[in-house]
Amino acid sequence: MTDCRYLIKRVIKIIIAVLQLILLFL
């Protein structure tokens, strides 16, 4: 229960990066 917000922000950044890669290959 230390850095939940940090982990959430990191996961969101990863998801955004994946979405950008998908858009590049569409």
Curated annotation (Swiss-Prot):
One of its GO terms (cellular component) is membrane. It is a single-pass membrane protein. Its main location: membrane. GO terms for biological process: programmed cell death. It is found in: Membrane. Keywords: Membrane, Toxin-antitoxin system, Transmembrane, Transmembrane helix. It comes from the Bacteria. Induction: In exponential phase. The ohsC RNA (previously known as ryfC) prevents the toxic effects of shoB overproduction, probably by repressing its translation. Expression of the proteinaceous toxin is controlled by antisense sRNA OhsC. The keyword DNA damage does not apply. The chain crosses the membrane at residues 7-24. Toxic component of a type I toxin-antitoxin (TA) system. May be a toxic protein; overexpression causes cessation of growth and rapid membrane depolarization. Overexpression induces stress-response and a number of membrane protein genes. Entirely encoded within a small RNA previously known as ryfB. This is Small toxic protein ShoB. It comes from Escherichia coli (strain K12). The lineage of its organism: Bacteria, Pseudomonadati, Pseudomonadota, Gammaproteobacteria, Enterobacterales.
